[in-house]
Amino acid sequence: MRHVPEPVEPDAPLPAGDTDAAYPVNEQHLEDFQVGGVERSLPPAEQLAQLVSYMKNSYPVPADDDALDRYLAALPDRLTHAAMLMLGSGLDHTMPGVAYGMDVDARELPELPELGARVFVPTDTSAGRWAVSLNPGFGPRAVEHHWRPLIAAIAQLSGTTIIDLPDPRDRDVAAVLDVAAKQRPSTTAIIATQHEPPDGFALISAAALVEPSPDYSAAVIGHPGTCGIIATPEEYRRIVRDIADRLRA
């Protein structure tokens, strides 16, 4: 049984920082660097600045595709570690897969085993919702350790059975949608960053999980076009909750 520690609540709420105030970045090379952050609650933009500084100095983004795949696969754990170090242990730094997706039943798709699809079944399937999620361009390791835990969290929060397709070619998408249709779902959606859904299928955008959006406090990884974002675990959870809400709507 996996032990998931409960988030530690501070004895008293940390004083909130003023959004317009000047906040020096708590960088490791500075003499006044404080392990665990500082005694104040930073605004989201300043929390992000702390994480970006740490990630850029500690984990340079590789150019090689295989190395980038490994980098993105390790990103959830690294962001949790960075948030604990830079923002303090009094906040909840669990990523969505751990916070929401631990009770999801993950299984193979027996109808199409050759596709490598994974089915995420939430604990409550009474709504009869189904969806197909399309990998936005991650390599195989990042699909398994970064993307799919996010999909599991969305499945659990929304009460939607989700089939994740790692290589979303058009003919494979059509085949998986056909499998979903045979389950007689109440609704069927496609979760993707960019895709033209067939008639009768809603498109639920997952773009905020892989590229910065004005609606969330997130930064690019490396250079524009790299699949993935730097954001606090709290912001990742907010993005996942919003996607789940759109599936339920």
Task: Label every PLM stretch briefly.
Residues 42-55, 121-123, 173-182, 195-199, ...:
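A structural signal for the main folded, soluble domain(s) of proteins
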Residues 117-119, 131, 162-164, 209, ...:
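Conserved beta-strand scaffold positions in the cores of enzyme catalytic domains, especially
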Residues 147, 155-179:
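Active-site catalytic motif of lipid deacylating hydrolases and related acyltransferases
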Residues 174-219:
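Primarily recognizes the serine-hydrolase "nucleophile elbow" in alpha/beta-hydrolase
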Residues 200-249:
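Alpha/beta hydrolase fold serine-hydrolase catalytic domain that processes acyl esters and thioesters
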Residues 120-159:
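Short, surface-exposed "cap/lid" segments of acyl-processing enzymes
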Residues 93-110, 117-134, 197-206, 237:
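Acidic, polar-rich N-terminal leader regions of halophilic archaeal proteins
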